[in-house]
Each structure stands twice: as structure tokens, then as C-alpha cells.
Amino acid sequence: MSHTGALAGPDLLYDGVFRQSGVIRAHSVTELFDFSWVLGGLPTPKGNKVVIQTHSGGPGAAAADSCGKVGLELPALSKKTLEKLTPFVPHTGSINNPVDLTYTKNPLDYFSDIPKALLEENNTDILLMYLLMPLHTVKFSPEHMGFRGDQVIEQTTQLFSTQAESIACLPETYGKPLIGYTFRGLEEQFIRELLKRGVPVFSDPLRSARAIRALVKYADRRKKL
């Protein structure tokens, strides 16, 4: 250790020491907080098999690439799970992994029945979920039904709260980690509701994948104790 607090000596040496000691190394302050966030609030996964749920091909491909970069596995889904998903997914979607729903027939299924089916899959350990519920889209339905002003705000706030609660309870119910990512921005109302309930949501799928890898490493090292 140098007088500045930096590690002195070959970096590979410290990697080896950390590995033997069971230390999960964070390579930046951002990673330190990301890893602490998921390790402190999510169930320990049984393995490194990730299923990705997304509403569109782009976010799904980005997440799949990110998982590949950090050594996570994307398993095929069982026939039973595929049969569960089929009623919810339009012909334009895909029920492979990543599960690309291309918007579901009922948008609210995205936050309830679909993630439940994926977490019930025996061949997966972790759900990585693209999270999107823009305010302008959600407001359209109550406005179309004749609600105005404060009534619209009340309706949208209730919907955000209900769907966020539906997502937040899944890790405890199924004993599997659920991690989110979004390209919309963490300041959006729905994302804030998720964060308030302890759901980790990242602005970059690679950060999500690295956080998942930290969870997997922790699980592996716990098994060796």
C-alpha cells in the first residue's frame, strides 16, 4: 500500500490474493457501489444462468452481449416455460432467451405473469429485466377515458406504484435475484418507484451484468466455505 492509499505492486498479484481470500474485486468506485447494492439486497443465486426479458430487440441484444462479456450463461428455456409464455407474446415477438416481447398483448403482463413464468423456470438462476413505463404513455389511457388534471396524476401514480410493488416482491417470492436496466433514465417516475422498493435498476446493461457476476462470484465463494 502506497502513501496515497493506492495498491503498490503487480495488479495480477492482488487479483490472485483477492481470489484466494474470497474478496470480490471492484475496479471502480461505481462498481463498488453497484456490487454493494445487489449483494446487500438480493437473494444469492444458485448459478450463473441468466434469462433476459425485454420489450424490444435492441435492449435484449445489448444485455445478451453484456452477459457474454462477463461470462454469464444464457440458457434455453424449457418447453413448459415456452408454453406458459406463448399466450402473452405476439407473433412479432420471440420466446427464446432473450425473451423479446415486442410489447405484449396486455402491457401489464410484462410486470406480472411473464416475469413469474421466467423465475419459475428451473434452468435459470437470475432474471435481467428491461424496465420501461414512460409517463406520457401511461397517461394516455386515463386521459382517453375522460380523466383530467389531478385524476390523471392519481391514476398514473397508482399504476406505477402497483406495478413496481409487483416487481419488487418477486425476488423474495422465488428466491432468485431480479436486476433491471433501462435506457430511459433513472429519474423517470416508474423507475423511482422501483428504486424506492429496493429493485436495483441500472442505466447500462453492462453495469447490470457486472453486478450479476459479483452475485455469482459471491455465491461460488460461499459454497467453498
Task: Label the model's feature ranges.
Residues 1-225:
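Catalytic-core regions of core metabolic enzymes
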